[in-house]
Design a protein with these regions (language model features):
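A glycine-rich beta-to-alpha transition motif near the start of alpha/beta enzyme domains, typified by
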Residues: 1-118, 155-201
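Intrinsically disordered, low-complexity "prion-like" regions in eukaryotic RNA/RNP-associated proteins
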Residues: 121-125
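Active-site glycine-rich loop that binds ribose-phosphate moieties when present
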Residues: 126-143, 170
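Internal active-site segments that recognize and position negatively charged phosphoryl groups
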Residues: 137-138, 142-165
């Protein structure tokens, strides 16, 4: 069988996009892992299946789309960056209004819009639980929070002068693999406050 796919990137993450209307059933996790493999497959951070939530209008557009995001290991979650990429894709294809619409993900509905001033897609997350303090032993700096946006995130606060030579991979891997976050792991973000209203990540 042959299926169309698209490969899009947004702020450092790349995704394989599939029109779910072409698929009688979603692939298994092992297939997703093969596609996302950067040596043997297409290479990607995740796979996005999409389909209109309602019938297309006369112009071929739909204001609400379903988004099924699968991580590179085949697990399902919500991905904020993936939703931005999908909106930009649907907008470019002429399948969603230029101003925005709604994406329905595994954790609920999220509004997407075009940020005219910055000329970038933006997503308004649905209500999420407030951040909580991460366990001190799961942190490398002792200053960390945990927030679940539909996808779990460990936020590690560091000093701005640490960013230049910060070993994101090894430090992040150490936190991701902590027993506290087993068995699925956690997204790890290193964030520095560089001004009254400025963050670097």
């Amino acid at each position: 069988m042959h299926f169309n796919f698209w490969k899009w990137e947004g702020t450092g993450n790349d995704f394989i996009l599939f029109d779910q209307r072409e698929w009688p059933e979603l692939p298994i996790a092992e297939d997703i892992a093969v596609w996302c493999d950067r040596e043997q497959g297409l290479g990607a951070d995740g796979v996005i299946f999409f389909q209109p939530r309602t019938d297309l209008d006369d112009s071929g557009k739909c204001a609400a789309w379903e988004m099924d995001y699968l991580n590179a290991d085949g697990s399902r979650s919500f991905c904020g960056n993936g939703s931005r990429v999908l909106f930009a894709f649907l907008r470019a294809k002429g399948w969603m209004e230029l101003e925005g619409g709604v994406l329905h993900a595994c954790d609920g509905a999220h509004a997407v819009k075009w940020h005219a001033e910055l000329e970038v897609p933006a997503v308004q997350l649905m209500d999420v639980n407030p951040p909580i303090k991460a366990p001190h032993w799961a942190s490398s700096s002792g200053l960390s929070d945990f927030v679940d946006t539909g996808s779990p995130h460990h936020i590690e606060w560091i000093e701005p002068n640490e960013l230049e030579a910060f070993d994101v991979f090894s430090r992040g891997q150490g936190i991701r693999n902590q027993a506290h976050y087993a068995p699925d792991g956690v997204n790890v973000d290193f964030v520095a406050c560089s001004g009254p209203a400025a963050l670097q990540m």
